[in-house]
């Protein structure tokens, strides 16, 4: 009788595919965007309009807030990963610690539709700096880095998803001007 311990070992025993140690995955980001979309649709339903511009605004604001929450779980780890590619954080390390708080502030204020004179510039600054930084790291320098977008302990590859996050923040800031 063979003793099998652990989920991965059980999958191997039955001939199933086992995810390689340290393999990259978009699953955490897909979960965030999926939950954000469902929340936005639920609030849209409550407000009487399921597929409206406000629902799209809420989707982006909820995404920003949830992504910020994931970063705030371990700010130190996030900061370490963020310093690998963010141009402003490389010049001013303190920015890497303030970034998740700024993203959360902008997201929550956008959900509430309150104090937009604070939310808009914060979203524009962090979104623009982030988009430029990701574009430079991935498409110009051709570096293969892990994205700090869902916190510091993820294996999400830096690239399209992080660029999308930053472009969504920029777009939301411009839209709400």
Listing of model-derived features with the role each one plays in the protein:
Residues 2-17:
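Extended, hydrophilic extramembrane loops/domains of integral membrane proteins
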């Amino acid at each position: 009788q063979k003793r099998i311990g652990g989920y991965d070992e059980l999958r191997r025993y039955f001939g199933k595919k086992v995810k390689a140690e340290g393999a990259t995955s978009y699953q955490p980001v897909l979960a965030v965007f999926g939950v954000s979309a469902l929340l936005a649709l639920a609030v849209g339903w409550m407000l009487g309009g399921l597929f409206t511009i406000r629902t799209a605004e809420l989707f982006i604001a909820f995404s920003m807030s949830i992504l910020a929450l994931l970063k705030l779980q371990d700010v130190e780890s996030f900061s370490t990963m963020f310093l690998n590619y963010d141009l402003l954080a490389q010049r001013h390390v303190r920015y890497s610690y303030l970034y998740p708080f700024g993203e959360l502030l902008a997201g929550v204020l956008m959900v509430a539709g309150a104090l937009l004179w604070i939310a808009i510039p914060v979203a524009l600054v962090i979104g623009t700096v982030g988009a430029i930084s990701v574009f430079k790291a991935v498409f110009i320098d051709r570096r293969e880095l892990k994205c700090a977008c869902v916190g510091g302990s993820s294996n999400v590859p830096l690239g399209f998803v992080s660029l999308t996050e930053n472009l969504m923040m920029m777009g939301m800031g411009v839209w709400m001007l």
